[in-house]
Protein backbone atom coordinates (compact mmCIF):
# COMPACT_ATOMS: atom_id res chain seq x y z
CA UNK A 1 0.00 0.00 0.00
CA UNK A 2 1.11 3.59 -0.63
CA UNK A 3 1.96 5.34 2.61
CA UNK A 4 0.18 8.50 3.71
CA UNK A 5 1.84 11.70 2.42
CA UNK A 6 3.42 14.05 4.94
CA UNK A 7 1.11 16.14 7.11
CA UNK A 8 2.24 19.29 5.29
CA UNK A 9 1.31 17.85 1.89
CA UNK A 10 -2.05 16.61 3.20
CA UNK A 11 -2.83 20.04 4.66
CA UNK A 12 -1.86 21.76 1.40
CA UNK A 13 -4.07 19.39 -0.62
CA UNK A 14 -6.96 19.80 1.81
CA UNK A 15 -6.85 23.60 1.68
CA UNK A 16 -6.52 23.49 -2.10
CA UNK A 17 -9.43 21.04 -2.36
CA UNK A 18 -11.71 23.14 -0.12
CA UNK A 19 -11.02 26.28 -2.09
CA UNK A 20 -11.62 24.60 -5.47
CA UNK A 21 -14.51 22.30 -4.57
CA UNK A 22 -16.58 23.78 -1.77
CA UNK A 23 -16.34 27.22 -3.30
CA UNK A 24 -17.55 26.13 -6.74
CA UNK A 25 -21.19 26.04 -7.93
CA UNK A 26 -20.96 22.36 -8.84
CA UNK A 27 -20.02 21.41 -5.27
CA UNK A 28 -22.26 23.98 -3.61
CA UNK A 29 -25.35 21.86 -4.07
CA UNK A 30 -23.65 18.82 -2.57
CA UNK A 31 -22.36 20.83 0.38
CA UNK A 32 -25.79 22.28 1.14
CA UNK A 33 -27.65 18.98 0.79
CA UNK A 34 -25.20 17.25 3.16
CA UNK A 35 -25.68 13.71 1.89
CA UNK A 36 -23.20 10.99 2.84
CA UNK A 37 -22.64 7.63 1.16
CA UNK A 38 -21.44 4.98 3.62
CA UNK A 39 -19.62 1.81 2.52
CA UNK A 40 -18.94 -1.21 4.77
CA UNK A 41 -16.79 -4.26 3.92
CA UNK A 42 -14.88 -4.99 7.15
CA UNK A 43 -15.83 -8.67 7.39
CA UNK A 44 -18.58 -10.60 5.61
CA UNK A 45 -21.27 -8.01 4.85
CA UNK A 46 -21.14 -5.73 1.81
CA UNK A 47 -23.19 -2.70 2.80
CA UNK A 48 -23.91 0.76 1.40
CA UNK A 49 -26.33 3.50 2.40
CA UNK A 50 -27.08 7.16 1.74
CA UNK A 51 -28.06 9.33 4.72
CA UNK A 52 -28.90 12.98 5.06
CA UNK A 53 -27.68 15.13 7.92
CA UNK A 54 -30.72 14.37 10.09
CA UNK A 55 -30.01 10.64 9.98
CA UNK A 56 -32.80 9.82 7.56
CA UNK A 57 -31.93 6.74 5.52
CA UNK A 58 -32.60 7.71 1.92
CA UNK A 59 -31.55 4.37 0.48
CA UNK A 60 -29.53 1.32 1.43
CA UNK A 61 -28.41 -2.07 0.17
CA UNK A 62 -26.80 -5.02 1.94
CA UNK A 63 -25.36 -8.26 0.61
CA UNK A 64 -24.87 -10.86 3.32
CA UNK A 65 -22.39 -13.70 2.93
CA UNK A 66 -23.86 -15.66 5.86
CA UNK A 67 -25.17 -18.62 3.84
CA UNK A 68 -21.81 -19.15 2.14
CA UNK A 69 -19.84 -19.03 5.38
CA UNK A 70 -22.30 -21.34 7.15
CA UNK A 71 -21.43 -24.02 4.61
CA UNK A 72 -17.68 -23.58 5.16
CA UNK A 73 -17.97 -23.45 8.96
CA UNK A 74 -16.65 -19.91 9.32
CA UNK A 75 -15.47 -16.84 7.46
CA UNK A 76 -12.65 -17.65 5.04
CA UNK A 77 -10.93 -14.32 4.26
CA UNK A 78 -10.22 -15.07 0.57
CA UNK A 79 -13.83 -16.16 0.02
CA UNK A 80 -15.11 -13.03 1.77
CA UNK A 81 -12.81 -10.88 -0.36
CA UNK A 82 -14.07 -12.41 -3.60
CA UNK A 83 -17.71 -11.97 -2.60
CA UNK A 84 -17.08 -8.32 -1.72
CA UNK A 85 -15.35 -7.83 -5.07
CA UNK A 86 -18.29 -9.39 -6.93
CA UNK A 87 -20.99 -7.39 -5.13
CA UNK A 88 -19.67 -3.99 -4.05
CA UNK A 89 -20.42 -2.10 -7.27
CA UNK A 90 -24.00 -3.44 -7.38
CA UNK A 91 -24.61 -2.75 -3.69
CA UNK A 92 -23.41 0.87 -3.94
CA UNK A 93 -25.41 1.44 -7.12
CA UNK A 94 -28.55 0.04 -5.47
CA UNK A 95 -28.13 2.34 -2.48
CA UNK A 96 -27.78 5.37 -4.76
CA UNK A 97 -30.74 4.37 -6.93
CA UNK A 98 -33.00 3.67 -3.97
CA UNK A 99 -32.14 7.09 -2.53
CA UNK A 100 -32.66 8.84 -5.89
CA UNK A 101 -29.29 10.48 -5.39
CA UNK A 102 -26.71 11.09 -8.09
CA UNK A 103 -23.04 10.92 -7.04
CA UNK A 104 -22.75 14.64 -7.86
CA UNK A 105 -25.17 15.39 -5.00
CA UNK A 106 -23.09 13.65 -2.35
CA UNK A 107 -21.26 15.75 0.23
CA UNK A 108 -18.81 12.97 1.09
CA UNK A 109 -18.14 9.23 1.03
CA UNK A 110 -17.43 7.42 4.31
CA UNK A 111 -15.85 3.96 4.28
CA UNK A 112 -14.68 1.49 6.92
CA UNK A 113 -10.88 1.31 6.81
CA UNK A 114 -10.21 -0.22 10.26
CA UNK A 115 -10.28 -2.66 12.00
CA UNK A 116 -11.35 -5.85 10.21
CA UNK A 117 -10.23 -8.53 7.78
CA UNK A 118 -7.43 -7.09 5.65
CA UNK A 119 -8.66 -8.64 2.40
CA UNK A 120 -12.21 -7.39 3.00
CA UNK A 121 -11.18 -3.87 4.04
CA UNK A 122 -9.02 -3.62 0.93
CA UNK A 123 -11.97 -4.13 -1.42
CA UNK A 124 -14.06 -1.37 0.17
CA UNK A 125 -11.15 1.06 0.33
CA UNK A 126 -10.02 0.47 -3.26
CA UNK A 127 -13.58 0.93 -4.59
CA UNK A 128 -14.16 4.04 -2.48
CA UNK A 129 -10.95 5.78 -3.46
CA UNK A 130 -11.69 5.18 -7.13
CA UNK A 131 -15.24 6.49 -6.59
CA UNK A 132 -14.27 9.72 -4.77
CA UNK A 133 -11.58 10.49 -7.35
CA UNK A 134 -13.98 9.90 -10.21
CA UNK A 135 -16.62 12.19 -8.68
CA UNK A 136 -14.26 14.59 -6.85
CA UNK A 137 -15.78 14.02 -3.41
CA UNK A 138 -14.29 14.27 0.09
CA UNK A 139 -13.35 10.96 1.68
CA UNK A 140 -13.97 10.11 5.35
CA UNK A 141 -12.10 7.03 6.67
CA UNK A 142 -14.16 5.30 9.38
CA UNK A 143 -13.19 3.24 12.42
CA UNK A 144 -15.64 0.32 12.47
CA UNK A 145 -16.05 0.30 16.27
CA UNK A 146 -16.54 4.06 16.39
CA UNK A 147 -19.40 3.62 13.94
CA UNK A 148 -21.01 0.93 16.11
CA UNK A 149 -20.68 3.19 19.16
CA UNK A 150 -22.33 6.18 17.50
CA UNK A 151 -25.21 4.38 15.74
CA UNK A 152 -27.56 4.98 18.66
CA UNK A 153 -27.21 8.76 18.17
CA UNK A 154 -28.80 8.38 14.74
CA UNK A 155 -31.92 6.92 16.36
CA UNK A 156 -32.35 9.16 19.42
CA UNK A 157 -30.63 12.09 21.11
CA UNK A 158 -27.81 10.70 23.25
CA UNK A 159 -25.42 13.30 24.61
CA UNK A 160 -21.73 12.72 25.26
CA UNK A 161 -20.26 11.30 27.40
CA UNK A 162 -21.72 7.80 27.64
CA UNK A 163 -20.39 4.32 28.33
CA UNK A 164 -20.46 1.86 25.45
CA UNK A 165 -20.11 -1.93 25.35
CA UNK A 166 -19.34 -3.16 21.84
CA UNK A 167 -19.61 -6.91 21.34
CA UNK A 168 -19.44 -8.76 18.03
CA UNK A 169 -17.88 -11.71 16.25
CA UNK A 170 -14.55 -9.97 15.99
CA UNK A 171 -14.48 -7.45 18.83
CA UNK A 172 -15.32 -6.88 22.47
CA UNK A 173 -14.59 -3.62 24.27
CA UNK A 174 -15.77 -1.15 26.88
CA UNK A 175 -15.16 2.55 26.30
CA UNK A 176 -16.35 5.98 27.33
CA UNK A 177 -17.50 7.96 24.31
CA UNK A 178 -16.67 11.61 24.99
CA UNK A 179 -17.05 12.87 21.43
CA UNK A 180 -17.33 11.78 17.83
CA UNK A 181 -13.62 10.92 17.76
CA UNK A 182 -12.85 10.95 21.49
CA UNK A 183 -12.92 7.63 23.34
CA UNK A 184 -11.39 6.26 26.54
CA UNK A 185 -10.78 2.52 26.28
CA UNK A 186 -11.54 0.80 29.61
CA UNK A 187 -11.46 -2.85 28.56
CA UNK A 188 -10.95 -5.11 25.54
CA UNK A 189 -10.81 -8.79 24.75
CA UNK A 190 -7.50 -10.48 25.49
CA UNK A 191 -8.07 -13.39 23.12
CA UNK A 192 -11.26 -14.00 21.15
CA UNK A 193 -14.53 -12.11 20.87
CA UNK A 194 -17.84 -13.38 22.35
CA UNK A 195 -19.44 -13.84 18.94
CA UNK A 196 -16.50 -15.92 17.82
CA UNK A 197 -16.80 -18.08 20.94
CA UNK A 198 -20.51 -18.69 20.40
CA UNK A 199 -19.92 -19.55 16.74
CA UNK A 200 -17.15 -22.02 17.60
CA UNK A 201 -19.25 -23.71 20.30
CA UNK A 202 -22.12 -23.99 17.81
CA UNK A 203 -19.79 -25.63 15.28
CA UNK A 204 -18.42 -28.04 17.88
CA UNK A 205 -22.01 -28.99 18.74
CA UNK A 206 -22.77 -29.44 15.01
CA UNK A 207 -25.81 -27.21 15.35
CA UNK A 208 -26.03 -26.76 11.58
CA UNK A 209 -27.42 -30.33 11.61
CA UNK A 210 -30.17 -29.35 14.06
CA UNK A 211 -33.51 -29.00 12.25
CA UNK A 212 -34.17 -25.63 13.90
CA UNK A 213 -30.71 -24.19 13.22
CA UNK A 214 -29.69 -25.10 9.66
CA UNK A 215 -30.01 -21.52 8.38
CA UNK A 216 -28.89 -19.71 11.54
CA UNK A 217 -25.50 -18.31 12.47
CA UNK A 218 -23.76 -19.96 15.42
CA UNK A 219 -24.75 -17.22 17.85
CA UNK A 220 -28.37 -17.28 16.68
CA UNK A 221 -28.50 -21.07 17.05
CA UNK A 222 -27.12 -20.91 20.60
CA UNK A 223 -29.68 -18.27 21.58
CA UNK A 224 -32.58 -20.23 20.07
CA UNK A 225 -31.72 -23.58 21.67
CA UNK A 226 -30.87 -21.97 25.01
CA UNK A 227 -34.51 -20.91 25.40
CA UNK A 228 -35.44 -24.55 26.04
CA UNK A 229 -32.28 -25.46 27.93
CA UNK A 230 -31.41 -25.81 31.61
CA UNK A 231 -28.25 -23.77 32.20
CA UNK A 232 -27.76 -25.23 35.68
CA UNK A 233 -26.91 -28.68 34.24
CA UNK A 234 -23.45 -27.36 33.31
CA UNK A 235 -21.58 -25.09 35.72
CA UNK A 236 -19.03 -23.22 33.65
CA UNK A 237 -16.69 -20.87 35.51
CA UNK A 238 -17.04 -17.20 34.62
CA UNK A 239 -13.68 -16.05 33.20
CA UNK A 240 -11.23 -13.76 34.99
CA UNK A 241 -13.00 -13.85 38.33
CA UNK A 242 -9.82 -12.90 40.20
CA UNK A 243 -8.67 -10.23 37.75
CA UNK A 244 -10.10 -6.89 38.79
CA UNK A 245 -10.17 -5.01 35.51
CA UNK A 246 -12.59 -4.56 32.59
CA UNK A 247 -10.88 -6.74 29.99
CA UNK A 248 -12.49 -9.88 28.59
CA UNK A 249 -11.38 -13.43 27.90
CA UNK A 250 -13.48 -16.10 26.21
CA UNK A 251 -10.97 -18.73 25.07
CA UNK A 252 -10.90 -20.40 28.48
CA UNK A 253 -14.67 -20.65 28.56
CA UNK A 254 -14.65 -22.26 25.11
CA UNK A 255 -12.17 -24.84 26.40
CA UNK A 256 -14.47 -25.61 29.35
CA UNK A 257 -17.39 -26.11 26.99
CA UNK A 258 -15.33 -28.31 24.64
CA UNK A 259 -14.30 -30.55 27.56
CA UNK A 260 -17.94 -30.85 28.66
CA UNK A 261 -19.00 -31.78 25.11
CA UNK A 262 -16.29 -34.44 24.84
CA UNK A 263 -17.34 -35.91 28.18
CA UNK A 264 -21.00 -36.12 27.15
CA UNK A 265 -20.07 -37.64 23.79
CA UNK A 266 -18.18 -40.38 25.61
CA UNK A 267 -21.10 -40.94 27.98
CA UNK A 268 -23.63 -41.17 25.14
CA UNK A 269 -21.30 -43.25 22.98
CA UNK A 270 -21.44 -40.93 19.98
CA UNK A 271 -18.77 -39.46 17.73
CA UNK A 272 -18.04 -35.79 17.11
CA UNK A 273 -20.48 -34.43 14.56
CA UNK A 274 -23.53 -36.12 16.08
CA UNK A 275 -26.04 -34.03 18.01
CA UNK A 276 -25.98 -34.55 21.77
CA UNK A 277 -29.23 -35.07 23.64
CA UNK A 278 -28.28 -32.24 26.03
CA UNK A 279 -27.43 -29.70 23.33
CA UNK A 280 -30.02 -27.19 24.61
CA UNK A 281 -28.56 -27.30 28.11
CA UNK A 282 -25.00 -26.73 26.88
CA UNK A 283 -26.23 -23.82 24.76
CA UNK A 284 -28.02 -22.30 27.76
CA UNK A 285 -25.02 -22.68 30.07
CA UNK A 286 -22.62 -21.23 27.50
CA UNK A 287 -24.85 -18.26 26.77
CA UNK A 288 -25.37 -17.57 30.47
CA UNK A 289 -21.63 -17.61 31.20
CA UNK A 290 -20.88 -15.26 28.30
CA UNK A 291 -23.65 -12.91 29.47
CA UNK A 292 -22.43 -13.01 33.09
CA UNK A 293 -18.84 -12.27 32.06
CA UNK A 294 -19.94 -9.28 29.97
CA UNK A 295 -22.18 -8.04 32.78
CA UNK A 296 -19.52 -8.24 35.49
CA UNK A 297 -16.88 -6.41 33.46
CA UNK A 298 -19.44 -3.76 32.55
CA UNK A 299 -20.42 -3.42 36.22
CA UNK A 300 -16.79 -2.68 37.11
CA UNK A 301 -16.54 -0.17 34.24
CA UNK A 302 -19.59 1.67 35.57
CA UNK A 303 -18.08 1.86 39.05
CA UNK A 304 -14.76 3.10 37.63
CA UNK A 305 -16.57 5.80 35.64
CA UNK A 306 -18.52 6.92 38.69
CA UNK A 307 -15.39 7.03 40.86
CA UNK A 308 -13.57 9.17 38.30
CA UNK A 309 -16.41 11.42 37.16
CA UNK A 310 -16.37 10.11 33.60
CA UNK A 311 -20.17 10.02 33.23
CA UNK A 312 -22.77 12.68 33.98
CA UNK A 313 -24.38 12.46 37.41
CA UNK A 314 -27.86 12.78 35.90
CA UNK A 315 -29.14 10.17 33.43
CA UNK A 316 -25.87 8.33 32.75
CA UNK A 317 -26.17 5.94 29.81
CA UNK A 318 -24.79 2.57 28.73
CA UNK A 319 -25.01 1.87 25.01
CA UNK A 320 -24.89 -1.79 23.95
CA UNK A 321 -24.06 -2.33 20.29
CA UNK A 322 -22.40 -4.74 17.84
CA UNK A 323 -23.69 -8.02 16.40
CA UNK A 324 -23.81 -9.89 19.73
CA UNK A 325 -25.94 -7.07 21.17
CA UNK A 326 -28.82 -8.58 19.18
CA UNK A 327 -28.87 -11.43 21.73
CA UNK A 328 -31.87 -10.77 23.98
CA UNK A 329 -30.51 -12.80 26.88
CA UNK A 330 -27.34 -10.70 26.94
CA UNK A 331 -29.45 -7.54 26.80
CA UNK A 332 -31.39 -8.73 29.85
CA UNK A 333 -28.16 -9.44 31.72
CA UNK A 334 -26.92 -5.92 31.04
CA UNK A 335 -30.28 -4.44 32.07
CA UNK A 336 -29.88 -6.06 35.50
CA UNK A 337 -26.57 -4.22 35.91
CA UNK A 338 -27.87 -0.87 34.68
CA UNK A 339 -30.93 -1.07 36.93
CA UNK A 340 -28.71 -1.83 39.94
CA UNK A 341 -26.33 1.04 39.17
CA UNK A 342 -28.80 3.69 38.00
CA UNK A 343 -27.87 3.80 34.32
CA UNK A 344 -30.11 3.90 31.28
CA UNK A 345 -29.50 1.02 28.85
CA UNK A 346 -29.85 1.82 25.16
CA UNK A 347 -29.57 -0.74 22.36
CA UNK A 348 -30.05 -0.07 18.65
CA UNK A 349 -32.57 -2.37 16.93
CA UNK A 350 -31.06 -5.70 15.90
CA UNK A 351 -30.81 -4.68 12.22
CA UNK A 352 -28.49 -1.81 13.19
CA UNK A 353 -26.37 -3.92 15.55
CA UNK A 354 -24.94 -6.09 12.80
CA UNK A 355 -22.59 -4.61 10.17
CA UNK A 356 -24.26 -2.34 7.64
CA UNK A 357 -23.66 0.70 5.47
CA UNK A 358 -26.08 2.84 7.47
CA UNK A 359 -23.86 3.05 10.55
CA UNK A 360 -20.85 3.98 8.39
CA UNK A 361 -22.79 6.73 6.63
CA UNK A 362 -24.00 8.06 10.00
CA UNK A 363 -20.46 8.14 11.35
CA UNK A 364 -19.59 10.10 8.22
CA UNK A 365 -22.43 12.54 8.91
CA UNK A 366 -21.21 13.07 12.48
CA UNK A 367 -17.65 13.72 11.29
CA UNK A 368 -18.84 15.96 8.46
CA UNK A 369 -20.79 18.10 10.92
CA UNK A 370 -17.70 18.66 13.05
CA UNK A 371 -15.20 18.80 10.19
CA UNK A 372 -13.15 15.91 11.58
CA UNK A 373 -11.19 13.43 9.48
CA UNK A 374 -12.37 14.73 6.11
CA UNK A 375 -9.82 14.15 3.37
CA UNK A 376 -9.62 15.33 -0.26
CA UNK A 377 -10.07 12.53 -2.80
CA UNK A 378 -6.42 12.56 -3.88
CA UNK A 379 -5.05 11.45 -0.49
CA UNK A 380 -3.94 7.82 -0.27
CA UNK A 381 -5.27 5.98 2.79
CA UNK A 382 -4.14 2.65 4.22
CA UNK A 383 -6.48 0.10 5.77
CA UNK A 384 -5.61 -1.16 9.26
CA UNK A 385 -6.69 -4.71 10.19
CA UNK A 386 -5.92 -3.99 13.85
CA UNK A 387 -6.71 -0.58 15.29
CA UNK A 388 -7.38 0.28 18.95
CA UNK A 389 -10.21 2.66 19.79
CA UNK A 390 -9.31 5.83 21.65
CA UNK A 391 -6.95 6.39 24.57
CA UNK A 392 -6.01 3.19 26.39
CA UNK A 393 -7.05 3.42 30.06
CA UNK A 394 -6.96 -0.33 30.78
CA UNK A 395 -3.90 -0.03 33.04
CA UNK A 396 -5.60 2.64 35.15
CA UNK A 397 -8.70 0.48 35.47
CA UNK A 398 -6.62 -2.51 36.56
CA UNK A 399 -4.71 -0.37 39.09
CA UNK A 400 -8.01 0.71 40.65
CA UNK A 401 -8.70 -2.99 41.42
CA UNK A 402 -12.42 -2.42 41.98
CA UNK A 403 -14.12 -5.36 43.67
CA UNK A 404 -17.75 -5.99 42.84
CA UNK A 405 -20.66 -6.47 45.17
CA UNK A 406 -22.62 -9.56 44.22
CA UNK A 407 -25.60 -8.97 41.94
CA UNK A 408 -27.86 -11.96 41.36
CA UNK A 409 -28.00 -12.69 37.63
CA UNK A 410 -31.47 -14.19 37.50
CA UNK A 411 -32.18 -13.84 33.80
CA UNK A 412 -35.45 -15.17 32.41
CA UNK A 413 -35.25 -16.96 29.04
Give each language-model segment a name.
Residues 27-34, 141-163, 363:
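Conserved phosphate-binding catalytic cores of ATP/NTP-utilizing and phosphoryl-transfer enzymes
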Residues 33-107, 111-115, 144, 148:
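N-terminal beta-alpha supersecondary unit
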Residues 141-142, 317-318, 335-360, 377:
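Conserved phosphate-binding/catalytic loops in two-lobed NTP-binding clefts
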Residues 114-120, 126-128, 133-157, 176-177:
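Active-site neighborhood for divalent-cation/phosphate handling
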Residues 314-334:
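Glycine-rich phosphate-binding loops at beta-strand->alpha-helix junctions
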Residues 242, 247, 251, 260, ...:
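Adenine-nucleotide phosphate-binding core of ATP-dependent small-molecule kinases
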Residues 29-34, 42, 49, 59-60, ...:
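A short helix-loop
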